Amino acid sequence: METGSTLSDIFSQLDVKMPYPPVSAKVNNKVEGLHYRVYNPKDIEYLDVTSASGSRAYTRTLFFVLCKAVHKLFPESNVVIDTPVSNGYYCDLRLGRPVTEADVDLIRSEMQSLVDRHLRIRRHQVPTDEAIRIFEDLGYKSKAMLLRTTGKLYTTYYDIEGFIDYFYGTMLVNTAQLTLFGLEKYYDGLLLRIPSRHDPTQLGALVRQDK
């Protein structure tokens, strides 16, 4: 393997059979995204969406794609990922008016378009002071305030086609890896549905409950 290859590149050169494609990996027992570059010999265990870490990476990336879709369709709005409910996540979509079924259909369609276009998800690591400036310039005041509290010298953020955001944890490397998701109107917001860890070819069962 070439020194500095990503975990994604390494997997593509291995003859390894997995029930489902990898979405992250344990490197010397520490969870890393498939963007991670390997420069020295490491113990690597690839993880799919049936693992807790893999499911979180998949879900986190869905959040990112949802945020990008909302930003394109409703640039003056805001979406907040809220509580886990009904085998998914309740999302508070702040449009300044009630959310309609038509809104949800538009967002779902835009998310699917982002997946179908097989877009790279780029990882950036910069000094935290620089990241704070970037998010302040974009008007993401709450994200900038959050970064001020991390106490870290460097911050990792991600972008899809120039749309950037900060998430704590690993992400997938391409939108095409999001093979299954659901988005539905749920009370006065959205329900983002994710694949079942027991059977990732199916969405988690929809059980309507209080958000």
Annotated model-derived regions:
Residues 36-55, 78-84, 90-211:
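Auxiliary tRNA-acceptor-end handling modules of aminoacyl-tRNA synthetases
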Residues 1-63, 67-85, 109-110:
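Ubiquitin-like/PB1-type beta-grasp interaction modules and other compact soluble beta-rich domains
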